[in-house]
């Protein structure tokens, strides 16, 4: 009999026999999308959740290790807390793309649970493990401090509705981004949908000698595996010049670490990841260019053959 792992998610007891990253269970099985998958390796903080009240990254915690724990995502926070953060982050302009915001809110709430009146330095320290690529953190810290004030006073200010040119207004999407129900591409789920992913180069510059897809294609649940030879006609893309290959084919040279050499389509995420590992790519590693000085040196490898102005 398979081992069962039981824990509570937002007040509901959940049981699974799968030992996998808790983030994948939350997103794939429960379709809780406030916890974002920004890195899958505990670096960015977009998947931060509460585990027994502490801020924890869900991508590095497994369902086995979560057994017996109380897990809370943004969706499970009390309504007054969510409303306080929605108002505060909207009032100070803390939300831009919004991808990092649910994780920021969770980290901030963990701070306020033990320190309801934090200093600016304490608020900044609380989100030290949460990366934001948009705001520079200043407005997020402003929002945390305002949310703390609102929660201490127990009253959310009324929003000004008589807007005029030049008035400060809240973003119309601030509520969905703070509370995590706004959908990004990775949050979209349709019954029966397939999952796609790229097999990427292990080297910044290398010639692709051989791509073997047979083992991946034979894995149950795999729909198809595509390489450059499956693209009819022009395969280069680009905004100004079409100088970026969609896929690097056999005999061609990669331009950077992570260049795509194959695409895999599967019935589920787990099968997709297994299939990607079964695609065998043989490379001839070539000298790479790591900076402008190397690139401009006599005899430097030519990364792109097109001339850029």
Question: Model-found features: residue ranges?
Answer:
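Signature of N-terminal electron-transfer/Fe-S-associated modules in redox systems
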Residues: 1-160, 164
């Amino acid at each position: 009999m398979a081992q069962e792992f039981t824990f509570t998610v937002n007040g509901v007891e959940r049981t699974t026999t799968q030992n996998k990253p808790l983030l994948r269970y939350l997103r794939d099985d429960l379709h809780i999308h406030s916890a974002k998958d920004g890195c899958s390796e505990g670096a960015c903080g977009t998947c931060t959740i509460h585990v027994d009240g502490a801020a924890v990254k869900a991508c590095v915690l497994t369902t086995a290790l979560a057994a017996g724990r109380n897990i809370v995502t943004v969706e499970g926070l009390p309504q007054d807390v969510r409303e306080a953060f929605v108002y505060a982050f909207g009032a100070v302009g803390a939300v831009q793309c919004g991808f990092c915001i649910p994780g920021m809110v969770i980290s901030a709430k963990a701070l306020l649970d033990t320190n309801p009146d934090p200093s600016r330095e304490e608020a900044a320290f609380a989100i030290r493990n949460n990366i934001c690529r948009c705001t520079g953190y200043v407005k997020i810290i402003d929002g945390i401090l305002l949310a703390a004030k609102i929660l201490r006073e127990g009253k959310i200010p009324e929003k000004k509705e008589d807007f005029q040119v030049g008035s400060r207004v809240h973003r119309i999407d601030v509520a969905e981004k703070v509370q995590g129900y706004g959908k990004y591409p990775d949050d979209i789920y349709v019954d029966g949908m397939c999952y796609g992913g790229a097999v990427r180069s292990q080297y910044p510059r290398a010639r692709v000698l051989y791509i073997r897809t047979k083992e991946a294609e034979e894995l149950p649940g795999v729909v198809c595996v595509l390489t450059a030879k499956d693209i009819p006609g022009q395969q280069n893309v680009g905004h100004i010049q079409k100088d970026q290959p969609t896929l690097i084919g056999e005999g061609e040279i990669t331009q950077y670490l992570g260049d795509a050499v194959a695409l895999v389509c599967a019935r589920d995420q787990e099968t997709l990841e297994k299939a990607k590992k079964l695609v065998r790519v043989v490379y001839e590693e070539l000298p790479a260019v790591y900076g402008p000085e190397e690139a401009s040196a006599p005899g430097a490898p030519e990364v792109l053959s097109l001339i850029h102005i």
